[in-house]
Amino acid sequence: IEANNANAQEAIMLNQNGYITECTADNIFIVHNGKVKTPPAYVGILEGITRESVLQMCKELNIESEEVIIDVKDLLTAEEVFITGTGAEIVPIRQINNIQFNIGKTTQKLIEYFPEFVKKNSTPVFVKV
């Protein structure tokens, strides 16, 4: 409701403890001190395929990453924020409420590597029509 009232393109969901979980249709990541962080499954998220791909990409690119509790303060003080989803792929977040975020080097690196990662890790499927 708050996101609709603010004409936001996406809403960030909190669990009953006030921790960041995910967005309405995407997983969420923050970058803090160069480390990529995303909420763990036990806070109440759907473990998306693209989310898992980003965690694997971080390993391949030697980017530190972890699944960790993220609270609102962590989110609003992050250097970078991005969301992931099958259709969205990797999308940088530019603004939350009145706080602006830049598309940082880490997010940009992941966006640029994503097509190569998908090509390398996908299985071709052919359907005879």
Q: What is the predicted role of each segment?
A:
Residues 1-21, 57, 63-64:
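Short, conserved active-site entrance elements at the starts or edges of catalytic domains
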Residues 20, 25-129:
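Conserved catalytic-core subdomain
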